[in-house]
């Protein structure tokens, strides 16, 4: 969705970050990147929204990249371990591609017993963060997953060509790694 917005003559890119249950994700650092350099950034507010002011430089390509690296244990509990184990045993399969992403604690694009071990180490305090993954992953809301039972690889950034107009609807789904029951 694009459209002109009156923001003091500035061009802005804006969107929101929600969980797959439509809860807003606050405190996500959203960066505007050009040629591997951060041009500007902001943290999402309590409703999960962000607005980035874009430099008036025609022809530039920009990347919008969300990151949240804090509170790795938030929302992660033994209930998540039980849920992943039931999935692995075929007793209660995941019903969302985002649960697969959340369960992939070691970031190897599959869900296995190794992920259970990694999540258990986080719960027990052996880890303060996942060694091979970030505490939150973000998926472009408009990304069409070819196989919801194997959602990898997925678009975790949005790339745009600057056209001199404001763009809204640059939305992401936030996935808390380890939190398959979405309690964070």
Which role does the model predict for each range below?
Residues 2-184:
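Cellulosome-associated attachment modules in secreted, modular CAZymes
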